């Protein structure tokens, strides 16, 4: 037999036919029962604890990522961006009532490995976004891509709607379109 069959024969001390059945997921001619995933309760959402200032976030976004100060200040003032106690950028996503429902964190460390993640319990449909007044929606994978785009194309940026999917989910885009049916032009600005 092959390597796997020989291994099963030796490890389980089975004859060849039974080793093959075991590898096929059967025992004594019956299918083995598939293990059920452990039931886990969904985690409740909580924003990361903010730090007392935003020096590292501003330094990182302005000097390392070259985002315009006006753009960073706008999102900070709107309470959509802040620095957590671990000095990460926290990008906040709000629901229709203005309540935080999503947070994406990204390290400000420019050396070594980059750390980014969505906070447990985040509602993926409420990712980091900005609603505008015109009919266009710009879609990005990451919040920093969104901020970079605004920096590169500043003309009329406050009129446009933007959403960062904070990954690859389509849910944030569908939610923006549901919330604002007048949006009729979607620009996919994806890597």
Q: What positions do the PLM features span?
A:
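Phosphate-handling DNA/RNA-contact segment within nucleic-acid enzymes
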Residues: 84-179
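Serine endopeptidase catalytic core focused on the charge-relay Asp
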Residues: 58-71, 94
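Non-catalytic accessory segments of DNA primases and related replication-initiation nucleases
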Residues: 1-62
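Helix N-cap/coil-helix junction residues
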Residues: 14, 66-67, 137
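Short, basic/aromatic recognition patches
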Residues: 67-84
């Amino acid at each position: 037999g092959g390597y796997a069959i020989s291994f099963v024969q030796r490890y389980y001390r089975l004859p060849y036919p039974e080793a093959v059945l075991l590898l096929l997921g059967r025992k004594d001619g019956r299918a083995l029962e598939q293990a059920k995933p452990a039931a886990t309760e969904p985690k409740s959402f909580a924003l990361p604890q903010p730090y007392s200032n935003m020096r590292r976030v501003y330094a990182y976004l302005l000097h390392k990522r070259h985002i315009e100060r006006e753009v960073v200040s706008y999102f900070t003032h709107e309470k959509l961006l802040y620095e957590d106690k671990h000095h990460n950028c926290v990008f906040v996503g709000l629901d229709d009532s203005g309540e935080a429902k999503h947070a994406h964190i990204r390290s400000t460390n420019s050396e070594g490995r980059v750390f980014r993640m969505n906070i447990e319990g985040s509602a993926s449909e409420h990712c980091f976004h900005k609603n505008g007044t015109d009919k266009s929606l710009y879609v990005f994978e990451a919040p920093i891509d969104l901020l970079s785009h605004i920096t590169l194309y500043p003309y009329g940026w406050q009129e446009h709607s933007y959403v960062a999917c904070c990954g690859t989910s389509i849910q944030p885009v569908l939610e923006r379109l549901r919330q604002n049916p007048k949006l009729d032009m979607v620009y996919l600005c994806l890597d």
